[in-house]
Amino acid sequence: MSTFAFLLFCAQACLIQNVCGLYLGGLGGCGCGGGWNGWNGLGGGWNGLGVGWNGIDGGYGAGCGSYGGEGIGNVGVAGELPVGGVTAVGGRVPIIGGVEYGGPACAAGAVSICGHCAPTCGCGRAGLGGYY
């Protein structure tokens, strides 16, 4: 097999993985119930929808703008990822799959993550606007 044919085969495999991988495992990692003894439940407590710390348009003035994005890939961080000062991300932050933290995730100040998931994330709670 020539080098060009091998590279063409690899490019086609990547394209097929990109197209078919969008719909595989869409419910992986998105639970339908509240986790952490109800802290992430649907209505009250920490990160609830409407009441509690960092609820949607709730405590500390943390409002939620629109979110949308998609992507496939792996991001690996080995070691430290220090961030000093203010870090703002404007635009899209595409995440498909699971997000896992091994060890402590320390933060000083206010940290809020708001967004809108696709219909499969959070089991498509249409009555709540799909917020997860």
Swiss-Prot record:
Q: Name one GO molecular function term.
A: structural constituent of egg chorion
Could you tell me which residues belong to the region Right arm?
Answer: 114-132
Q: Where is this region: Left arm?
A: 22-65
The entry assigns this protein to a family as follows: Belongs to the chorion protein family.
Q: Where is the signal peptide?
A: 1-21
The record's GO CC annotations read: egg chorion
Q: Which GO terms describe its biological process?
A: chorion-containing eggshell formation
Q: What does this protein do?
A: This protein is one of many from the eggshell of the silk moth.
Instruction: Report the source organism.
Output: Bombyx mori
Q: Which UniProt keywords apply?
A: Repeat, Signal
Name recorded for this polypeptide:
Chorion class A protein L12
Q: Where in this protein does the record put region Central domain?
A: 66-113
